[in-house]
């Protein structure tokens, strides 16, 4: 049964306070599922390890060449480490057994960072805090997705029946593991509800650390860019209106357009162009003319691990339908499939391999929004995008609901479908450019028709501020 949440919260805060006062004299151990890739879980572990730098890290498999964050740390592995990394997805029962018999009862404080089996370790009563990302997804929340595509390529045909056969036993073992931690901490309101649903345990939400500072410097650049692009767009619209007026007046044998007004527009555009190149140090060779400047900064972006449940196929299909440019950055089992899906549209879809953080920041400078079509417990990448002043178009489920403010720092779409995402892209473009209608389902409408007062996106600097509560500083506090 789930205990009273306020009582649990107070007890957890009290215990954390007690441990924090004694941490210099405590014998502390850290545990994680594996250290073979760089991801959100590993980032959480890195921040916790900085708080307890002398604590050993227990894990099932470790590959320092794949993740170099823990060089010099006391990383301890067992017999599973002799197996190749690619076997990680095959050995769930072995990994459960490994952690089940890992005895850490000699430690005064054990912190497991787990979305899988690390929570199974043995500890003495009252010492085990589990920072649980979400109940093991391929046993619980995403069994349908894993059944459809277990992620083993041509071996899927053999894996599916084995998965169905083992699932009841794996679930039973996972529930046994879930009973071992004394206290649960988790990453989002969504993850909290999943832990309550499947494990019948109460969890305290502490948002995971995001390196906000590294990305927030992009927001200032984007603020200048977006402001100038919007000015350009405004003048383009004014020019179009004047040209339309000229056509109508000529057609009706009326006086020609007011040349003085037209010359004013041309002068303003020249001044804007000079201001752009002077203020943000952009070379004129980068764009043919001022009208094309906005087009350079006119693509959507996603950088993530490319796996089936991320639903990056939706982003590609929606952008092709809407004739919108999209840049996908990353690698994974779906990489080649995504390339094949987009190969007929090289003018719209660009797929790049995994890039460095500095390279990603350069792409964020020119992106108008991050597309986040997956249902995830949290989502580090979209928060990094927000920190860079880049709004997010997100599926209206999962951890995104903790940081997306609809029509302020992003736009939600309600169904994990191409049509729903297309409607969100149209809505976003309306808010971004403030120039066109959008369609939601079969109904064509405008934001002003939906709301009593006009709603528009925050500026890049304001968007960046909405990500500040997810900083590493806040996490450590």
What feature does the model see in each segment?
Residues 51-119:
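Active-site donor-binding segments of glycosyltransferases and PAPS-dependent sulfotransferases
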Residues 92-97, 416, 440, 444-447, ...:
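A charged, aromatic-enriched C-terminal amphipathic alpha-helix characteristic of glycosyltransferases
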Residues 151-184:
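Membrane-proximal helix-turn-helix segments that form the acceptor-binding/catalytic region
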Residues 225-230, 292-310, 316-323, 327:
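Conserved donor-binding/catalytic core segment of Leloir-type glycosyltransferases
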Residues 290, 336-358:
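Nucleotide-activated donor-binding/catalytic signature segment of Leloir-type glycosyltransferases, i.e.
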Residues 365-377, 390:
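Acidic donor-binding loop of glycosyltransferase active sites
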Residues 391-395:
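Short hydrophobic beta-strand element within catalytic cores of glycosyltransferases
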Residues 406-407, 411-419, 425-433:
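Conserved acidic donor-binding segment of nucleotide-sugar-dependent glycosyltransferases
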């Amino acid at each position: 049964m789930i205990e009273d949440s306020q009582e649990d919260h107070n007890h957890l805060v009290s215990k954390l306070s007690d441990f924090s006062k004694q941490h210099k004299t405590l014998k502390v151990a850290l545990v994680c599922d594996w250290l073979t890739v760089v991801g959100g879980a590993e980032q959480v572990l890195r921040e916790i390890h900085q708080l307890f730098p002398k604590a050993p890290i227990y894990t099932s498999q470790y590959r320092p060449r794949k993740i170099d964050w823990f060089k010099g740390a006391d990383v301890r592995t067992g017999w599973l480490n002799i197996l190749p990394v690619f076997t990680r997805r095959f050995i769930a029962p072995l990994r459960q057994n490994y952690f089940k018999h890992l005895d850490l009862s000699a430690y005064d404080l054990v912190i497991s960072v787990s979305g899988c089996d690390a929570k199974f370790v043995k500890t003495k009563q009252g010492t085990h805090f589990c920072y649980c990302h979400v109940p093991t997804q391929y046993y619980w929340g995403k069994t349908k997705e894993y059944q459809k595509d277990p992620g083993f390529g041509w071996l899927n045909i053999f894996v599916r029946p084995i998965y169905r056969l083992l699932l009841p036993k794996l679930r039973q073992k996972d529930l046994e593991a879930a009973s071992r931690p004394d206290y649960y901490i988790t990453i989002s309101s969504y993850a909290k509800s999943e832990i309550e649903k499947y494990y019948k345990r109460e969890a305290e939400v502490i948002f995971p650390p995001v390196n906000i500072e590294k990305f927030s410097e992009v927001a200032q650049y984007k603020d200048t860019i977006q402001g100038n692009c919007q000015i350009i767009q405004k003048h383009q619209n004014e020019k179009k209106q004047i040209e339309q007026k000229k056509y109508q007046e000529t057609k009706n044998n009326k006086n020609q357009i007011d040349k003085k007004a037209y010359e004013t527009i041309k002068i303003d555009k020249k001044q804007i162009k000079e201001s752009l190149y002077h203020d943000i140090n952009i070379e004129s060779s980068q764009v043919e003319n001022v009208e094309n400047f906005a087009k350079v900064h006119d693509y959507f972006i996603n950088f993530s691990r490319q796996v089936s449940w991320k639903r990056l196929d939706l982003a590609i299909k929606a952008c092709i339908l809407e004739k919108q440019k999209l840049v996908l950055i990353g690698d994974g089992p779906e990489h080649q499939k995504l390339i094949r899906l987009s190969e007929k549209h090289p003018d719209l879809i660009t797929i790049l391999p995994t890039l460095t953080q500095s390279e990603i920041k350069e792409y964020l400078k020119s992106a108008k929004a991050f597309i986040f079509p997956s249902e995830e417990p949290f989502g580090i990448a979209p928060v990094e995008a927000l920190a860079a002043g880049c709004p997010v178009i997100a599926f209206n489920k999962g951890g995104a609901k903790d940081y997306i403010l609809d029509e302020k720092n992003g736009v939600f779409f309600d169904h994990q479908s191409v049509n729903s995402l297309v409607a969100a892209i149209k809505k976003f473009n309306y808010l971004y450019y403030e120039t066109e209608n959008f369609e939601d389902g079969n109904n064509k409408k405008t934001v002003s028709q939906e709301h009593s007062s006009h709603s528009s996106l925050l500026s890049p600097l304001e968007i960046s501020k909405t990500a500040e509560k997810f900083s590493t500083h806040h996490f450590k506090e």
